[in-house]
């Protein structure tokens, strides 16, 4: 790029020096001059050498060159270096001279509009309309089609028709060899800009990609691709930003996007350096000063500096809505939704029709819990711009949420699908109520307004609600302060995670974000939430594991506490993200254990007043360097204490074949404490169905590292072998050990329910049912077994609740569940019992026990006590009789759902 730039500069110098007057008398000479030289000047302009462009354009003007583009490039270059008043004067002259040139009028309209000259911009509309009509249809070039399409959009045409009638035909023109026809590149760029304006970043990326096929080094296409990819693929977006700056080192857009990214990642010094580069070219650049205002707020909590920088940003155009829109959007990205919303209100005060601010304000209101104020704004944007993807998605989301039910208490508004509310709504209230009491008292916070909590069964709805776009895969919940959004525990995304632990985690964010007025770094908020999970229940949260041990002791993966935010921002994969959560929790644990909870509360209070986190920690503990040293020692000792007798070395290929049982066994003789070899041996013994040897090896594995409950743990291996030997008692014993250590051993809980059910151990059934429902409350068998256990313990109210949930989840034998409901209801609610019996008989007319109980209720006989233990000998309902039997069918018993043993834990 540098060599090409030097060549262009030499060429342009030749233009300025070698041709003081025309060398040829031909009338077409000036046109040839334009055709030869304008492409090179455009390239110089795109690379940010505005000073050279101004000189060349002034020379062209003195020569009387006919193309309007010399004048347009002249005033655009003047504006780019901050000479706005001169640029306006030149633009006015150009507007008077070129009233019929569509390309000139488009650039003039854009210049006047983005710099706040509303009357001049409006005046160009009439000129645009006349100029567009003046282009004969048969004579339209590819570039004419692009210009006509852009003019049509400005004049309010339907975007789909513009694509169909103008951009589409222009893009269908085929290149001739390596030569790109004039207008083809522009057609793809115009399509990309249109998609970007409608927030359809996928289509924008596709169009920018087509443009790059034609012009691989075009800065506009490279930067456009960066913007389109950045929200969904930061790594790819960063690559295109770097490519943009390789071609145009001082490209304003690329520099500013890099600065915004640096601000998002709390790299404030880097952001300042990037802004300095922009201002080295244009000291008055409005967006650069907008970012300086943001830095004043986030980095220094300096309100005076904020207002000064904002004032400079508005000095070019005092009513520019873009300034406060940008400020608010970035502040909201940093969870400062109140400040962000106020900024959008200022932007809308400048221009009530400024749609980006209106849409961003709708998002801010959603995150602040002001839902009723958000939807009308989103509708206004959708009405004004029917092709805006985000506005459309918000309309769809509103309809989805409208179908939700609300579970309300004085402290919470819980929104979720009505069918889900019936299943786990009460449990949500129980957990949140406990969390508010425990955590509120612990952190000395009284929240006097309801917290909004929403559960989404659809990942896309969760993403739109939480992020304003698709994405967020892998995230179970998000807290914005007074609003929590969560994936439903029944959603695919939730998988086998413990939703109760997640809910506790998210409500802890409510406490800490409220305490700090959302002025705290992500790492500290996450660290406290994970820490409080473990305080609530020992097997919640995160524990040391082999991966974390290796990262601490062998990979030097601990992030210095002073740079903890980068642990999240620079995480290279999902494991690095999880380790960031874990290390954040360890920092909090170390802080509380060493300095006390009161110091943590004091740090949060300082953050709420605008202090930076490192300053707050140092103020209430020790200097940051000393704190980092003590923490590193703390974390290292934890890692060293994890499996101290375990051999963690990696075997050489010649020492052990991981696929050969004999090779593994031989290696273990010399390395009896080797973690991976022991795991592999146990696994292969199971595959070989050598149950006794597998049990012995699993015991050795458990003894080696009893804390390990991850994939392929000794408890699971041993349980599989014991089950294969039909040793249910031994299997249950080892699974109980696993269940006590892991809050996500779903299959172990299911198996324990079955084993305890068969033994009539009702307390065991109830305990493991609660564990299982904390992961997936939509498992009908768990509710059924829980109901049977409560019935056996003469707890009819709890039994009814469980059986009702089982019935809602479409059991294989609904008649039998209804019979059990009736049996537990008949004492307190005979009418409800009667309804359930009638429904049971409607499905199974020959259900004798149901007939008997119905007669008992109808005749008003005294109700008899529930037989004990009813669950051990369930009363199955007969199958419904065929509708047109040829002969009297035999009575057929339907087995209780789940009688077939469930798979052992994997």
Positions of the model-derived regions?
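Beta/coil-rich, acidic/histidine-enriched accessory regions frequently appended to metallopeptidases
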Residues: 28-32, 36, 42, 46, ...
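Single-residue signature of alpha-solenoid repeat helices
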Residues: 53, 87, 121-124, 162-163, ...
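Juxtacatalytic substrate-recognition/specificity segment
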Residues: 27, 43, 120, 124-127, ...
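Short coil turns that delineate tetratricopeptide repeat
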Residues: 31, 65, 99, 133, ...
């Amino acid at each position: 790029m540098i060599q090409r730039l030097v060549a262009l500069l030499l060429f342009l110098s030749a233009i300025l020096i070698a041709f003081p007057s025309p060398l040829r008398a031909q009338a077409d000479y000036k046109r040839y001059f334009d055709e030869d030289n304008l492409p090179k000047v455009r390239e110089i302009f795109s690379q940010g050498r505005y000073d050279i462009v101004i000189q060349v354009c002034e020379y062209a003007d003195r020569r009387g060159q006919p193309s309007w583009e010399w004048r347009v490039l002249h005033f655009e270059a003047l504006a780019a270096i901050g000479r706005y008043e001169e640029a306006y004067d030149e633009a006015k002259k150009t507007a008077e001279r070129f009233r019929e040139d569509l390309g000139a009028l488009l650039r003039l309209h854009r210049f006047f509009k983005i710099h706040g000259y509303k009357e001049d911009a409006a005046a160009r509309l009439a000129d645009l309309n006349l100029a567009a009509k003046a282009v004969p249809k048969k004579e339209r070039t590819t570039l004419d089609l692009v210009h006509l399409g852009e003019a049509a959009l400005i004049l309010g045409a339907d975007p789909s028709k513009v694509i169909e009638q103008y951009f589409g035909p222009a893009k269908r023109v085929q290149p001739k060899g390596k030569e790109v026809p004039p207008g083809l590149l522009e057609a793809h760029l115009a399509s990309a800009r249109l998609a970007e304006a409608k927030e359809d970043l996928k289509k924008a990326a596709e169009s920018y990609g087509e443009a790059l096929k034609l012009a691989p080094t075009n800065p506009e296409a490279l930067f456009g691709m960066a913007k389109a990819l950045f929200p969904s693929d930061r790594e790819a977006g960063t690559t295109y930003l770097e490519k943009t700056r390789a071609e145009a080192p001082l490209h304003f857009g690329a520099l500013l996007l890099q600065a915004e990214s640096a601000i998002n990642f709390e790299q404030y010094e880097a952001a300042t350096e990037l802004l300095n580069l922009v201002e080295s070219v244009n000291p008055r650049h409005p967006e650069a000063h907008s970012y300086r205002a943001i830095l004043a707020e986030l980095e220094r909590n300096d309100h005076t500096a904020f207002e000064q920088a904002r004032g400079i940003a508005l000095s070019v155009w005092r009513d520019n809505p873009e300034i406060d829109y940008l400020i608010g959007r970035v502040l909201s990205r940093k969870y400062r939704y109140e400040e962000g919303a106020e900024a959008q209100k200022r932007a809308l005060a400048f221009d009530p029709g400024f749609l980006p601010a209106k849409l961003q304000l709708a998002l801010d209101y959603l995150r602040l819990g002001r839902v009723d104020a958000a939807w009308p704004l989103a509708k206004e944007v959708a009405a004004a711009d029917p092709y805006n993807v985000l506005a459309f998605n918000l309309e769809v989301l509103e309809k989805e949420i409208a179908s939700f039910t609300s579970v309300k208490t004085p402290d919470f508004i819980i929104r979720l699908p009505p069918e889900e509310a019936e299943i786990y709504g009460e449990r949500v209230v129980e957990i949140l109520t406990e969390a508010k009491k425990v955590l509120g008292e612990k952190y000395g916070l009284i929240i006097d307004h309801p917290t909004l909590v929403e559960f989404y069964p659809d990942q896309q709805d969760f993403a739109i609600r939480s992020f304003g776009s698709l994405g967020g895969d892998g995230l179970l919940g998000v807290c914005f302060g007074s609003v929590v959004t969560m994936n439903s525990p029944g959603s695919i995304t939730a998988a086998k995670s413990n939703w109760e632990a997640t809910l506790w985690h998210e409500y802890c964010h409510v406490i800490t974000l409220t305490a700090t007025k959302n002025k705290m770094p992500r790492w500290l908020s996450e660290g406290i939430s994970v820490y409080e999970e473990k305080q609530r229940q020992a097997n919640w949260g995160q524990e040391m594991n082999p991966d974390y041990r290796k990262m601490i002791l062998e990979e030097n993966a601990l992030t210095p506490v002073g740079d903890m935010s980068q642990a999240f921002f620079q995480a290279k994969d999902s494991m690095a993200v999880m380790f960031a959560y874990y290390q954040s929790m360890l920092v909090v644990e170390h802080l509380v254990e060493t300095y006390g909870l009161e110091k943590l509360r004091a740090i949060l209070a300082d953050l709420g007043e605008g202090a930076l986190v490192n300053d707050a920690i140092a103020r209430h503990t020790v200097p940051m360097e000393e704190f980092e040293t003590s923490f590193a020692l703390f974390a290292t000792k934890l890692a060293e204490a994890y499996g101290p007798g375990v051999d963690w070395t990696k075997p050489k290929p010649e020492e052990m074949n991981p696929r050969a049982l004999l090779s593994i066994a031989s290696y273990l003789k010399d390395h009896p404490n080797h973690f991976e070899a022991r795991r592999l041996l146990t696994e292969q013994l199971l595959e070989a169905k050598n149950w006794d040897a597998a049990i012995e090896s699993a015991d050795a594995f458990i003894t080696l590292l009893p804390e390990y409950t991850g994939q392929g743990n000794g408890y699971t291996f041993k349980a599989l072998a014991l089950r294969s030997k039909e040793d249910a008692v031994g299997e249950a014993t080892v699974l109980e050990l696993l269940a006590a250590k892991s809050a996500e051993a779903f299959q172990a809980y299911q198996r324990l329910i079955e084993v305890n059910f068969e033994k009539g151990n009702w307390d065991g059934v109830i305990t493991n049912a609660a564990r299982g429902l904390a992961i997936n409350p939509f498992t009908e068998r768990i509710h059924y077994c829980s109901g049977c256990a409560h019935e056996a313990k003469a707890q009819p109210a709890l039994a009814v609740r469980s059986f009702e949930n089982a019935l809602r989840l479409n059991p294989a034998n609904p008649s039998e569940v209804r019979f059990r409901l009736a049996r537990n209801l008949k004492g307190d609610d005979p009418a409800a019992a009667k309804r359930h019996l009638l429904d049971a008989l409607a499905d199974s007319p020959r259900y004798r026990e149901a007939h008997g109980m119905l007669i008992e209720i109808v005749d008003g006989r005294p109700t008899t006590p529930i037989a004990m233990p009813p669950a051990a000998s369930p009363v199955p309902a007969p199958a419904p009789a065929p509708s047109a039997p040829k002969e009297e069918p035999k009575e057929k018993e339907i087995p209780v759902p789940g009688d077939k043993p469930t798979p052992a834990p994997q």
